[in-house]
């Protein structure tokens, strides 16, 4: 008898359940991964645009320069950092004088950056003024904004300066607050603004404390030079703390909070490249300052730098930028020469009167002008003699 063929299902109910479960799980995992990736992209996109919007608020298009290829991680650059004590840096606000002026020179070849302080009372020509004008260097920002500040410092020490950032003191406080404060060993003991600082004792400072620490001047035996050193100390410590903070979620909050207190001509793309390509330079730093002497100009107290000191700082910055040394010849070297000729001495140890003489160009301008005119006269005489020897003059 022929046996009937029996139908056997592919598996039991349990087996079928296992089969479906085995094939469904990859889809579930895939969807979860896609959702996670999508959420991450959405999050970082959101943070990116929040950060970009915050940075865009700090951008000053009036002094914009092309930055294509400038920040590739190999090229060196310098930024003029300025600090003011005015309110928020709204575009409609009246500019104040800069209490702090620091050149930040970034050198990827040596994986370091250098901070060089320019004393606020430094005598300098205001480059870009309608007529010849000599003021304290901190007046440049009030008179002609960031461009006059960059041009005046550039001419003072003969280095090219294309970029700047001006920060209100309130902005520094907020930045320090958002990174959780900074730890500093004070360079001297003093009390200021309700805060007590002990020399050499590691002290945790919030925004207000760090600001008080960097502001005090009159109780420092070194005066403004001591204050400049403390300012560089705060900035250096803040930079190191900022790069150690890895939480991207706080970045847009930090930038949003300080956007009304910062102005710069570095666009968002440039800041991105600096943060990415020069991160290794932030771990090592050196510092210096332009040293001057007390002098009275029209009954006002100034700092006047000898030509040798201007040359020293110029050589140092140019070396960090990979540039050849050049002999400084400007208004300040001209004024030094004229004042020394009339009895001024940088070695006197006393506060002396310093006079400003008319200046229209290079150092030794009168001699060069005389030589140029004499050369023209000599050429004319030679030409007339040559013509007189020709037959048609006879």
Question: What is the predicted function of each stretch?
Answer:
Residues 366-367, 374, 383-386, 393:
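Tryptophan (W) side chains
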Residues 138-197, 264-267:
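Amphipathic, coiled-coil-like alpha-helical scaffolding segments used for oligomerization/assembly
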Residues 2-112, 300, 305-314:
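Entry/capping segment at the start of metal-dependent catalytic domains
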Residues 88-92, 135-143, 158-163, 218-225, ...:
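Second-shell loop/turn segments in exported
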Residues 57-60, 125-128, 265-370:
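C-terminal solvent-exposed extensions
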Residues 98-100, 134, 146-154, 169-173, ...:
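Extracytoplasmic/secreted envelope proteins and their assembly/folding machinery
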Residues 70-75, 174-253, 262:
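Flexible, polar/acidic helix-loop-strand segments at domain edges
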Residues 74-77, 95-101, 110-118, 132, ...:
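Extracytoplasmic
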